[in-house]
Amino acid sequence: GVSSAASDVYKRQVNMLDIAAGGPGEFSKRPFLKAHISPLISPMRYGEDAVDVVYECIKHNIPISCITAAQAGATAPATLAGFLTQSLAETLASLIMVHAIKPGFPMVFSNWPLVIDLRTGAFSGGSGETAVLNAASAQLSNWLNLPSGVACSMTDAKAIDAQYGMEKGITSFAAASAGGNLIYESSGMTASLLGVSFEAFVLDDEMHSNTYRALRGIEVNEDNLGYNAIFDAVLGDGHFLGGHHTLEAMERDYFYPKLADRDEPKTWFDNGAEDAWQRARTHAKKILASHNPNYLSKKQDKEIRSRFNIL
């Protein structure tokens, strides 16, 4: 996604995207990114510049994520029910505006309830209130049969530590369990959205993979109930290790993380006693050193660099 408060920026971006897509007008035929816009300024008023951006995006067929990001006790009521009442109305106002300009234009219903610490005014993206508010936002979007975007797995921690894991995990799982379609301000973000980390990117990838696995739930069918496997184990070796039923489940039913430590303590200590941050840093460095995809032709790369201020 892309984001800017100035409509003229999108004109230049579309020119760049056309080069990548194959020529003038090609991006609009098959857009491959969307714009993040906040046309509503809480509480309850349109922002003139942002509305201009909406017009520009519709002109170039750029799908839109219309974001409402009020803050509890500051730009929205401090009560959670009151907050959701206002933010839902604001996001609906964005939808109505887009539909009035061009009926049916693709828009993600992005109601992002945000929380501040009312003692200090500091943004609190990793709070329990943030978790429950964004889960409720996802549920409201589903109730309206609209594609939802919510803010989740944010953290106020500045390091990859226990606070980081606690805050990211609870907000990620809450949004997913509530049926959120898209999540934002998530992977790699730290320090109340003021920081970003390569280590956080790879750790968050595993966190979300675990969340996805939990969402899959438990499939119940005749084979998975395992009657024959239980029979064979009881009358045979007395365990399930190495059995065909176990090996099939191993590949199908389990997620195996690359970074999470599951060694017994002595093995972990003998291997350097690395914590999650250290393991993530090593993994991130390997990716940065080896993963160099080339999505543009040399001609496209040269044209973009000649027309735009890119080093």
Where are these regions (language model features)?
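Single conserved hydrophobic/aromatic residue that forms the stacking wall/gate
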Residues: 1-6, 10
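Hydrophobic beta-strand segments of well-ordered beta-sheets in folded domains
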Residues: 4, 31-36, 181
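Active-site-adjacent beta->alpha loops and helix N-cap segments on the catalytic face
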Residues: 11-18, 46-49
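Alpha-helical structural signal in soluble globular domains
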Residues: 16-20, 56, 140, 214
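Alpha/beta enzyme core
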Residues: 19-30, 56-60
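Flexible, glycine/charged-enriched surface loops at secondary-structure junctions
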Residues: 27-30, 67, 102-109, 145-151, ...
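Glycine-rich anion/phosphate-binding loop at the beta-strand->alpha-helix junction
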Residues: 37-207
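Catalytic-core signal marking the mid-to-C-terminal active-site face
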Residues: 199-311
